[in-house]
Regions:
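Short glycine-enriched, charge-decorated loop/helix-capping segments at active-site entrances
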Residues: 20-26
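A conserved catalytic-core segment of Leloir-type glycosyltransferases
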Residues: 1, 7-15, 27, 36, ...
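Short amphipathic alpha-helical face segments that pack within enzyme cores
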Residues: 32-36, 128
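Short His-centered aromatic/hydrophobic patch
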Residues: 121-126
């Protein structure tokens, strides 16, 4: 059985191309690092799929790309966007009240597609 990874990158301002590096504190070099990490993981023979899970944002101040539920990155890599919290963009420190809803959505999604995740990874630094 080949491995399936889920990487959480919660704030939502991440996409496969044209990264908005430096837009705010949530869009620094870590977004570039995360994209390189998931692509590298997917290119190993032991890995079948890498899902980058982030927040779906439907805000007129933010590019429409961040409101796409699924974005193909390359074979074995996709960005999945889930709605949790308000439609507008929120910096990561304000997402705490909505994480239970995201957890429920993730469990439901992976049950529905009958997929088991081998490893889940995140690099969160949330001030509570």
């Amino acid at each position: 059985m080949r491995l399936k990874f889920l990487h959480l990158h919660l704030h939502g301002l991440i996409r496969s191309k044209n990264l908005e590096l430096g837009r705010d504190a949530d869009t620094g070099g870590q977004t570039q690092y995360v994209l390189e990490l998931i692509k590298s993981l997917a290119n190993t023979s032991e890995v079948d799929q890498v899902d980058l899970v982030t927040r779906l944002i439907n805000d007129p101040k933010i590019d429409d790309e961040y409101s796409q539920e699924e974005e193909f990155v390359e074979p074995g890599v996709r960005i999945l966007r889930f709605k949790f919290g308000p439609n507008k963009y929120l910096r990561k420190e304000l997402l705490w009240p909505y994480l239970d809803h995201l957890t429920e959505r993730l469990i439901s999604y992976y049950k529905k597609i009958k997929s088991l995740i081998s490893f889940m990874h995140t690099m969160l630094m949330l001030d509570k």
